[in-house]
């Protein structure tokens, strides 16, 4: 009569392993540690979007600067600034929308991908690895998120993210490719402070 209980225990352990794969955690923690210990990070990113049929929807070049929980993202004339509490999203013309960091939790920004802090928001599993690279799948714990899963390619030698493929709930995909990353960038604190004077005089700000 003990056999069913042995199998039950086995499957419970297997389920737990699949939710938080220890092998994947080691790799992810190395990314997080490198980001946490950095005083400034400068990243060049390429984002390629495709619809559910695989048709390319566009390519964007993005510059991202990070310092702790603050970041400044620029794509063409558009900007996103986060001072750690408030996110300012400039449309490149004359409008800024403001939101709290907590309000942005349903989306997955490049900053969140690169931060390496996955434990709180994801289950994860190691899909494949070589001596130099690892493929890790992230599944959001909160099913209200705007995406189904994220597939990471990690450079194990550099302990850095190489790319991330994000699949949304409509089966559209976005490939985020890290072109270059500098973990020792010197970034001034005022870069992450909102400065009304740098924007057009007719700027409108919406909460």
What is the predicted function of each stretch?
Residues 5-7, 32, 53, 62, ...:
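Residues embedded in well-ordered secondary-structure elements
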Residues 19-30, 36-40, 44-50, 55-57, ...:
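Flexible, processing/modification-adjacent segments and terminal tails
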Residues 122, 127, 131-207:
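Gly/Pro-enriched, hydrophobic low-complexity segments
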Residues 61-108, 174:
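An acidic-aromatic
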Residues 1-24:
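Bacterial Sec-dependent N-terminal signal peptides
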Residues 59, 68, 75, 119, ...:
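Short beta-strand-initiation
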Residues 34, 62-65, 79-80, 124-129:
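Short, exposed beta-strand/loop patches in secreted or surface proteins that constitute
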């Amino acid at each position: 009569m003990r056999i069913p209980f042995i199998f039950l225990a086995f499957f419970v352990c297997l389920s737990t392993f699949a939710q938080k794969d220890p092998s994947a955690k080691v790799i992810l923690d190395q990314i997080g540690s490198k980001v946490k210990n950095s005083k400034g990070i400068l990243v060049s990113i390429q984002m390629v979007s495709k619809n559910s049929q695989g048709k390319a929807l566009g390519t964007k070049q993005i510059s991202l600067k990070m310092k702790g929980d603050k970041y400044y993202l620029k794509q063409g004339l558009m900007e996103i600034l986060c001072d750690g509490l408030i996110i300012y999203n400039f449309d490149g013309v004359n409008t800024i929308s403001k939101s709290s960091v907590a309000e942005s939790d349903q989306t997955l920004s490049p900053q969140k991908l690169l931060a390496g802090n996955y434990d709180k928001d994801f289950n994860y599993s190691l899909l494949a690895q070589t001596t130099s690279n690892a493929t890790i799948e992230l599944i959001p714990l909160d099913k209200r998120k705007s995406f189904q899963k994220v597939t990471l390619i990690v450079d194990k030698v550099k302990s850095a993210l190489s790319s991330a493929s994000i699949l949304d709930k409509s089966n559209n995909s976005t490939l985020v490719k890290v072109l270059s990353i500098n973990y020792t960038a010197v970034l001034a604190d005022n870069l992450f402070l909102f400065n009304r004077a740098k924007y057009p005089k007719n700027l409108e700000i919406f909460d």
